[in-house]
Amino acid sequence: MSDGSCIVVNYDDATMPADGIVTIAKTVNIDGTDYTVSGILGSENWTAEDSYYDNGKTSYDRAAFANCKTIKGLRFADGSGVTWIGDHAFRFCSNLKTIENIPSELNDIQSWCFEGTALESVDLSNTNVTIMKDGVFYNNTSLTSIQLPNKLENFWDNAFYGCTALNNIVMPSTVVGIYNNVFEGCTSLSNVTFNDSYTTLGHHVFKKCPLAAVTFPNTLNSIGEYAFESTNLNTVDLSNTQITSLPNGSFYNCEQLSDVKLPKALTYIGDHAFYKSPITSITFPPTLQKIDAWAFQNAHFKNVVIPTQCSLIEQGAFSDNANLTTVFVNGLECYLAYKAFWSCPKLTDIYITSNKEPVAGRYGFPFDNNPKVHVMMDFVGIFSELKTSENYNPCNTTHFDSDFSLTLGKEWTTFTSAYNLDFSGYEDLTAYTAKYNEANDAVALTPVKKVAAHTGLILKGVKGETYTLPILDSNEDGLDAVTDNQLVDCVDAVWSSNSNEDYFLSGGKFVKSINAGWALPGKSFLYISSGRVNQSESPLRVYVDNTATAINGITNNPVVKDEAYYNLQGVKVQRPQHGVFIHNGKKVVLK
């Protein structure tokens, strides 16, 4: 070439070294002139003037060493200036086991270059390669390890497809994209160390890899279809990613997967996304709009809460959930398609919220075992008019009512609902609103009876007791006026930060949020917009403001059992001297 370089274009079996090790020289002398070897020919590097070297070869076989069965090793001379290796250059060199002394100048290994070789270990760490191109190590079934280029940015399609012996991958910090089928069929790949900056995972990228764990960084914005099909993942945390859509089959048939945290901004879950993945619980973000067909078939949920913005649950989305007992449909207009909750033998209660009269048939035959359907009182008649036709019962149930069943797991718990509810029918169950009092750095509770939907509450009742509360009309009069309530309602899940503003009820006191995460639907938490006065890390005490003075409120509150002293107005006293005080929930006299 005019620049003083040359390329390797072919080989001669007759001159192949006895040991099968081919050395790519730094320079070659042609007609008395030294030329620097800069590349190894690929099938697509041919031009019209290259016909001299064609020798009747066609297609991929024109690549330099394609289909060479006698080459066993490749070695680059010291100081080699090879910067590129062409496509298919060593394709089907089925006895090629080693590559040694790879030059640091190498910046381009083209597509399908080492397809079907017998390479066992490759070190590209010191090269300048930025892309693992299409099929570059496709079906290298003997490849057990590879040290990737330190400057690598992208994996193109099928780069390591079918490398069945590959067991470990460490991603350089520069990688941003891992595209389609890159590690599909790598049936020994159990460990991948990811960086914290990649953005894209393509279709089928880890399909049928025995991966047990994956770290998903906050830079990740897309996952392709069937990306993790049939992997061994047991937990998936996507909560901090930028993903808005989980496509079809994303985590299809992940038989060990029990715990999933979805992205905060997720709007769509594709069909078969978690098919046959035995997830035990899941929290849907409030942004979710659609769950497609068979998305959670064969999951192990006990209850499901469909968020308010979700308008469509497609066919079979939650079918064959053997443990599912309760479903809350918070969507104002949520269509439940055919067999949406089919073959859920323990499903007994469906709560449907709507601010509009339901269209007959909207909830047509999504269930199959006669569950109870609970709706607002003014909608009971409309739902009950959905008659059985000759072929099916549109709701597949004969029971519609306006009752809300509530079982307390603890004596004190937080609660919220998408319904207007009446708590006045029980002596041993009380609902409270809450307000933070800066003066004494405590939380005051105020009892309420008839409560509007979307009101954060604290409940006190009998642990393990089940209460049946009337669901009131959507326009019910006489609801208790609630002012200054600082409990955030979580009809849908609410993302809570680990700040000094969010507090959760624990052991009868409010404790500061430790880690960011979802506040679960059906619960509530205390939000102090300006934070606590003293920025204390200690739990916030609670007193019941149900009498004229704070004395009886504190006295009657078994939750307050700390070692502090309070005066008769409920204010904490740092060094009590003489007089009457409240201590550990009781009146004491100091003399």
Regions found by a protein language model. Name each.
Residues 13-15, 355-357, 378-383, 462-466, ...:
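Acidic glycine-/aspartate-rich tracts in secreted/extracellular proteins
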Residues 364-402:
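Extracellular/surface-exposed low-complexity segments
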Residues 381-391, 465-472, 533-541, 571-591:
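Short, surface-exposed terminal/edge motifs of secreted or surface/virion proteins that either
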Residues 1-16, 386-388, 392-435:
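GGW-centered surface loops in extracellular recognition modules
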Residues 4, 17-39, 45-84, 94-108, ...:
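Structural signature of tandem-repeat unit edges
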Residues 435, 547-591:
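C-terminal outer-membrane/trafficking sorting elements
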Residues 395-425, 447-551:
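A short, polar beta-strand/turn micro-motif
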